[in-house]
From Swiss-Prot:
The gene is cccA. Not essential for growth on minimal or rich media. This is Cytochrome c-550. The keyword Transmembrane applies. NCBIfam families: cytochro_C550. Keywords: Cell membrane, Electron transport, Heme, Iron, Membrane, Metal-binding, Transmembrane, Transmembrane helix, Transport. GO terms for cellular component: plasma membrane. It comes from the Bacteria. The chain crosses the membrane at residues 5-25. It is found in: Cell membrane. The lineage of its organism: Bacteria, Bacillati, Bacillota, Bacilli, Bacillales. Heme c binds at C60, C63, H64, M99. It is a single-pass membrane protein. InterPro entries: Cyt_c-like_dom, Cyt_c-like_dom_sf, Cyt_c_BACSU-c550-type, Cytochro_C550_firm, Cytochrome_c550/c551-like. Binds 1 heme c group covalently per subunit.
Amino acid sequence: MKWNPLIPFLLIAVLGIGLTFFLSVKGLDDSREIASGGESKSAEKKDANASPEEIYKANCIACHGENYEGVSGPSLKGVGDKKDVAEIKTKIEKGGNGMPSGLVPADKLDDMAEWVSKIK
């Protein structure tokens, strides 16, 4: 019995196409997790119960510093003396001038703005 020499190449091509299709479908399934940065629903529940200080440590410390002194973002010390709570809330909510928006859950904006205004 004589085999066609193209059969091994054909089998490899079919296997490659099948593997590519499978990995593409798998990637689409994982896209939601990738888009959320790997956070699960339990992380969302944790954020809902987080204190302003915990939210700060999770989202703000990289730019505003461990002691609120400012790193790449401005210092938060005494910001309550310069701006009222409503202005601080708007800044946290909408961002601007290099600050991203949406870092604080909407239901925690008032608590966070009040907390930031009291930093001395």
